[in-house]
Amino acid sequence: MHPDSSRKLALKAVVNQTFCQVCGQESHGAHFGAITCRACAAFFRRVAAGANFEVKCKDGRGRCKILTNGRSCCKKCRLKKCKDIGMDIQNFQFNRDSFATSTKVAPSLSTFLGRPEFLLSCSPGTSASTSQNKFIDLSPFIKNCKQVLMDDRKIPLAPGKTRLQKLSSSLDFEISANNKKKKTDLRKVSTLGFSEAIQIFENELLMTSKWLAHFEEFHDLGNDFKFKFLECTWNIWNRLERVARTAALLRDQKISNGKGNEIILARNCVIDLRTVKFEVEWFTNYSLSEISYFIEGVGDWSMNKPLQAIIDFNPTEIELNFMLAQISLTCASKQMDSQYQETIDNLQKLIADDLHSYYIKEMRLPVYSSRIQKMMKVNNMVLRVMWERKEKLSIARMFNIFNPNFSHPELVKDVF
């Protein structure tokens, strides 16, 4: 008789057996060629096919008793009994999943192409092109800024004013219904392209330089320090100045939720985000929709985060200039060499003394900690937006999304 046939007959003879042939407990059915309980079936499935440990007999004689409670059994003797009653590893079944599985993870399309998912739909005619990068010469702007910073004349000649008052004289945030001329001077920008961006860039550099020139102690420092300071701080200075100027406009329009549609870009420029047209061909090979995540005012709205806080605070011009000085000195202390740290600390102490004098003598406010707290809240929000922006720019550089070639790249490291 065929061995398989005899095995089937033997199994059929005991199929009605109600007890496990290994341990004597109540059986669960036929498992691997014998009638066993679930515990013995699981034991055989786990151990018989090759355990990761050496199975040894407990007493060393190979005659251990298989207890009916299924516990504390000798594994070697239990396995031997399983095999003696006809349990066979050939009855093991593998790969019974309804779908095929693989240990190898299939590469995603973004991994295969080497581009992030938000750029996968880009057209080969534009996004994959290798057009020559646009060269942008910043030398004229730098020359003008150096002339302002290195001018031997002290600006302004006002010995009776404090440092913060001198700084305030270089800025004017009065945008109100009573000053219709200033409101009409605001030029609405309908298109943001290369020429508009360069004009705004030049305006922001010169504004920061002229403001710093009103800081007498800063004016007396070395030229290398002054230009390095401008290089580190002009962007964060203009971010806060832009937020403050926008808040003044929104406050005048009685928009208190910080979600106005108009955002002031520079001293006399304003943009309506509902209608403005962005031209990005001069700094990228991708379309605007493909890289909107990286463009402020399109897919990146983080610049609006500090608006409500500064609208609620409503700082005076002296307080605003202190905020501008404090945030600039904070950024400079983190980016400039340690040899300049003492100089920066001294400048911070000078403006702090002026602010204290302003609160005590002019505002008659002996306890002003709450206003300091509100100022620091706005500055910290602007700094946080700046750090988040830097993270996005690092991703953009990794994938070569922005491709303009600047003559002085260190000056625009926080922009492109």
From Swiss-Prot:
For this UniProt record, the keywords arranged alphabetically read as follows: DNA-binding, Metal-binding, Nucleus, Receptor, Transcription, Transcription regulation, Zinc, Zinc-finger
Q: Where are the zinc fingers (NR C4-type)?
A: 20-40, 57-82
Question: SUPFAM superfamilies this protein is in?
Answer: Glucocorticoid receptor-like (DNA-binding domain), Nuclear receptor ligand-binding domain
This protein's GO cellular component annotations are: nucleus
Q: Which residues form a coiled coil?
A: none
Record bears the keyword DNA-binding:
yes
Please give one Pfam family short name. Answer: zf-C4
Protein's recorded name: Nuclear hormone receptor family member nhr-59
Task: Give the organism, scientific name.
Answer: Caenorhabditis elegans
Phylogenetic lineage: Eukaryota, Metazoa, Ecdysozoa, Nematoda, Chromadorea
**What is the gene called?**
nhr-59
